[in-house]
């Protein structure tokens, strides 16, 4: 009897093993059903999946991705798919809600940007300008159509490589039986992107004119990666004639800098183009944001690469012609955050402005979490400093062994945590000090003094968070010492920095990068 049971169990095991093998074989031979959001995601995913899947796209040409809201039918398509691929939550802002509504657990959700850090979107940037190296805030800055962060990474061939790698890795992990094909397809596609990247680098690295003027501020990453300056203008759209007042101011701006072209995301109507040419003396040209291609265009052979090369050709109408440096219409750099304010605007603050639990950013610098930040800063500096030099600079600035600080504004206490050991002291407000830095911008230190005689190195503390009047801090730089407030005023090289303890390292990196 025991032998029969063992034989039966053995047969059952063999049967299930065979069934599993068959299931894997069916999956390997079958096609993965993938739903994507808009054209670049569709194009990249199709290039990776190849013949191993059916790739579809929710948004058709003519749909504005920034304003798109999925229908019930669209959500069902996602629900019925094997995988759903999108670019970023700052582009497809509806994705988080769709994720919550999905009842099927089988759908693999892939975010194209993965763990990429983004820059601030237009309208959300504090316009923090890299300033003098001796200023404690000058080179460390924090957290923009209106996105909190700019999602248009696909318009830079250099960054598109990372997007393709992210999609490849996620799909390969979800479908290991097809991973070999996905990786081979992705390798071929990435080689094409590398060639495109080389073309952009060759054409733009020695551009005679580094600035271009655009109506749609979607080309920030492209400008950043190839050494250009994107300058966006307001009040000019391709299908509506500008007001007489706007034409007048635009005409002055165009003449001042010798601007020959303003770039639109689509062909400007003949009336708009004629008005710009006649009244402002500037031509309209198209830089495609590549948010959609029609079936007709795709059948005619147009794709990501043809459109991006056309963009490069059009961009060279500006970059190949020498001229004076083009600056934005308005200087938005002289903000309070950047240290430009009047003395009368500075107000006293209470410890409650910094209430909460705070963590040092220094460990994230040490473990590499902030490395993308240094890469971005190096590109923004346009050769003034390398990523390694930025990291060294911030290593000096951020360095501290006080890993956590807890502040109770009501009790007026600060608790310093070092290697798990806590020290708590009670503080009184000791006034404010306005400091002027070598470049001409300024900062405010808000000073506090411990009541306890045994406070030692924590006797005197000073907060700096780019604000000059009462408001709740999102982060801060803290200076402390046991000698005097005056001695702390001279400290410009070392500024331990703290963010909320509820933030992850990546969230902090994103905040720093966008400021």
Swiss-Prot record:
Protein's UniProt name: Zinc-binding protein AdcA
Region His-rich loop, annotated ranges: 129-148
Region Disordered: start-end pairs: 126-148
S-S bonds: none
A GO BP entry: cell adhesion
Coiled-coil region(s): none
Source organism of the structure: Streptococcus pyogenes serotype M3 (strain ATCC BAA-595 / MGAS315)
Protein's gene: adcA
UniProt KW keywords: Ion transport, Metal-binding, Signal, Transport, Zinc, Zinc transport
Domain statement: The His-rich loop facilitates the closure of the zinc binding site and is required for zinc acquisition.
Positions of Zn(2+) binding: 66, 152, 216, 291
UniProt-recorded Gene Ontology molecular function terms: zinc ion binding
């Amino acid at each position: 009897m025991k032998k029969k049971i063992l034989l039966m169990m053995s047969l059952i095991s063999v049967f299930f093993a065979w069934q599993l093998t068959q299931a894997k074989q069916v999956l390997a031979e079958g096609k993965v059903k993938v739903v994507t959001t808009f054209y670049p995601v569709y194009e990249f995913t199709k290039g990776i999946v190849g013949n191993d899947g059916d790739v579809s796209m929710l948004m058709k040409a003519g749909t504005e991705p920034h304003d798109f809201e999925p229908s019930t039918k669209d959500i069902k398509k996602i629900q019925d798919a094997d995988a759903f691929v999108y670019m970023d939550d700052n582009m497809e802002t509806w994705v988080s809600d769709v994720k919550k509504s999905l009842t099927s657990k089988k759908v693999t959700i892939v975010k194209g940007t993965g763990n990429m850090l983004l820059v601030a979107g237009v309208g959300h940037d504090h316009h923090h300008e890299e300033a003098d190296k001796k200023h404690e805030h000058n080179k460390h800055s924090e957290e923009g159509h209106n996105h909190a962060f700019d999602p248009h990474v696909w318009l830079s061939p250099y960054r598109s490589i990372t997007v393709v790698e992210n999609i490849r890795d996620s799909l390969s992990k979800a479908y290991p039986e097809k991973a070999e094909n996905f990786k081979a397809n992705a390798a071929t596609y990435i080689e094409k992107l590398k060639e495109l990247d080389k073309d952009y680098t060759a054409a733009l690295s020695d551009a005679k004119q580094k600035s271009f003027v655009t109506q749609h501020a979607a080309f920030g990453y492209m400008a950043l990666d190839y050494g250009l300056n994107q300058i966006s203008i307001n009040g000019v759209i391709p299908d509506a004639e500008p007001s007489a007042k706007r034409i007048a101011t635009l005409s002055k701006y165009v003449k001042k800098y010798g601007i020959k072209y303003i770039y639109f995301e689509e062909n400007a109507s003949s009336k708009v183009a004629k008005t710009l040419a006649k009244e402002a003396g500037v031509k309209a040209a198209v830089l495609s944001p590549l948010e959609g291609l029609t079936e007709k265009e795709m059948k005619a052979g147009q794709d990501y690469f043809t459109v991006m090369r056309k963009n490069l050709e059009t961009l060279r109408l500006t970059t190949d012609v020498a001229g004076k440096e083009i600056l934005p219409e308005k200087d938005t750099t002289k903000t309070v955050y950047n240290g430009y304010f009047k003395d009368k605007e500075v107000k006293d603050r209470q410890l409650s402005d910094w209430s909460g639990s705070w963590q040092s950013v220094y460990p994230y610098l040490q473990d590499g979490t902030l490395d993308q930040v240094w890469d971005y800063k190096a590109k923004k500096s346009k050769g003034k400093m390398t990523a390694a030099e930025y990291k060294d600079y911030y290593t000096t600035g951020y360095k501290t062994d006080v890993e956590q600080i807890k502040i109770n504004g009501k009790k007026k206490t600060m608790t310093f945590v070092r290697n798990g050991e806590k020290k708590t002291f009670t503080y009184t407000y000791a006034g404010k000090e306005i400091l002027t830095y070598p470049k001409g911008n300024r900062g405010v230190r808000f000073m506090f003094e411990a009541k306890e005689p045994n406070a030692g190195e924590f006797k005197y503390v000073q907060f700096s968070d780019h604000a000059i009047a009462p408001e709740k801090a999102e982060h801060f730089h803290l200076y402390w010492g046991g000698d005097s407030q005056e001695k702390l005023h001279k400290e410009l090289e070392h500024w331990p920095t703290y963010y909320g303890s509820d933030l992850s390292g990546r969230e902090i990196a994103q905040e720093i990068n966008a400021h």
